[in-house]
Amino acid sequence: MNAHRTLIISVFIVASCGLAYELIIAALASYLLGDSILQFSSVIGLYLFSMGIGAHLTQYIKDKDVLHRFIEIELLVGVIGGISALALFVAFGLSAAPFRTLLYAFVLIVGAVVGMEIPLVMRVLNQKGAEFKELVSKVLTFDYLGALAVSLLFPLLLAPKLGMARSALLFGIFNAAVAYLTARVFKAELPRYRAIRLRALIVLSILAVIFAYADRISFKAEQSYFGDPVVYQSHSPYQRLVVTRWKDDTRLYINGNLQFSSRDEARYHEALVLPAMQMVPNAERVLILGGGDGLAAREVLKYPQVKNVTLVDLDPDMTATFKTSATLSALNQGSLSHPKMHVVNDDAAKWLEGSSEKFDVIIIDLPDPSNFSLGKLYSVPMYRLVARHLQPQGKIVVQSTSPYFAPNAYWSVVATLEAAKLNTAPYHVYVPSFGEWGFVLAGFDKQFPVPQKFDVPTSYLNAQTAAEMFRFPPDMARRKVEANYLNNQILVSYFESDWNNVMR
């Protein structure tokens, strides 16, 4: 193969690999540590900084050693970048404390060696007689094309199909392959060609073996982290789902955060759904935003007068899993396959904007507002949009985090609903696996009669427990906090601050 062409192809590959490691490490940090904005910002910022350091260090490499050093760096990037995700999974499974140290160590080291690649390629091309203006334009063009390719392939294909660990290893193999190919093309200029080729083959073999066993290793690491045996895991473009089971306790985790335990989820879902359904006795049309596990839908379908339930959940993997898995569909009693159900996989706000339907009860069972993407779904504009789809005597209910552990966030949700010109009735319930958890009822009228009885079978709620839900002790009393608007996303700040105080 032509030497010039080999190096240009190498630029495309190393650029793809360099961005891939950055995306993988940032995504892992956001999944495992939460707060995606902070994690992506800190990882990308530190990565770019370390790339600058790496680029600076290349000036100390002698011209006669440039080609040899480029090949060595490709092997080094392949090994460190390739194992980065798997090592981080294992570290997090053992303990979250050294995870942060290892995370930023990988960012610094991988960023530094990636930063050395392009300057060294340009120097090699320059030594081969490439004209400067052509050299710069070609290298940067293929650099940016490689970045574009991986930015599209990673979220749409690689992460969902291979997962984080195997994606990183695949790019590590690409880096090692570049080293091997470059060594072969330039073997006449490499005094120690055989030794270099042997090292490249060893690295390729090691990465290939680890790639083959990566899922098993990450599976073991996740079992160590979650404690209970992992029975299902998937990585969609939107989130990472993990289901664990120990004896009669099945648990769902999204991005490492517990969503429910089968031992006590009835407390949560009865509290979420039944008060609103009892307050609208002739509710026929119900909308559920989120709730892709089908557990809220299970409670709604207890009411025989319900004619239609529309469930809007962003992640098709979530709804498909809880529809087709025998174990999980048993938990929701087959609600997602019920003839009254209509499941839509779409963004909740986008779907509401495109729909003209009105509903008697709207249940909002979305993940906590831990980042700006979720925070917008708890904003004044969002609740105004929801209200446009509510019948005059209808009710909205929102899961609203914990009024005990995250009081500022909880009461901000109440203030946000009120800023959207809705009347509210806050309430809470104790869920053993979560602790104290909060909800907010909202509607156009001011009447929120506490149910004196329930027309459907319950395992937790009755007249007494329902009355207790609407009483708040002094340590959960209302706080003076701001409503959440898109331009300030104050709710995300409240949520982070509240939970950080709990974790200290």
Question: What do the PLM-derived regions correspond to, one by one?
Answer:
Residues 445-504:
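SAM/dcSAM-binding transferase cores
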Residues 1-233, 237-257, 261-328, 333-432, ...:
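Alpha-helical transmembrane segments of multi-pass membrane proteins
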